[in-house]
Amino acid sequence: MWMIAASAAWILLLRMADSAPPSSREHQGSSVPDMKMTGFHLVETKDGAKLWEIWGDAAEVFEKEGVAKVKKISRQVAVTLYSEQGQLTSLSDRATLNMRTKDVRLDGNVTATAEPGSSLQTDSLDWSAQERRLFTRSPITLVKGGLLSRGVGMEAETNLERARLFGRVRSQVLQHRVDELRRDLPIPRKGGS
C-alpha cells in the first residue's frame, strides 16, 4: 500500500511539474528542484527484475539535469542494489539517482553489507546499472571472509564476491578468523612413527 501511495505521489508530482507555466520553470535555475518529497521510497525494475530500491527522509528532483537527490534528515538513506550476483544493502547520508541511466551514487558515511556477509565502508560509492558493478575512488575498508583490506579506489561485483582495490592496499587476517584457522590445523604429534 505504501509503495502504491509513493508511486501515485511521484506521478502526481511529475504531472504538476510538467503543467507549471514555462516562465516559472525558466526562472528556477538548476539549483531549485522541480519537486520536493518527504518519506521517499522508489523501486526501479527492468524486465520485471528489481534493479534497486531507495528509501530516504527527503528527496528533490531536478528534471532538467535528470537527477533525484535523496538525503537524510533523521535516518540515513537506505539503498538496496540487486544483480544476478546478489544484493547489497547500504546506508549513506545522501544518494543521487541518475534518472536516465538509473545509476546510483552514495555519499557520506557509506556502509554496505552484501548477502554473503562481506561489508565495506567508504565516503562515496557509485553503482552502474548497466554493468551492475560498484566503483569508488575514495579510501575504502572491505571486510570479506575474515580478511580486512584497506586501500584507495575499488571496483567490485554487487555482492562484493570479487573486488579489486586499486592503491595503497593493506590487508590483515582478523583475529577471530586466525582462531578459526588454528582450530582447523592438525595437532602436531611428538615422537617417532
Language model features with spans:
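Mature-chain termini and adjacent capping regions
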Residues: 1-193
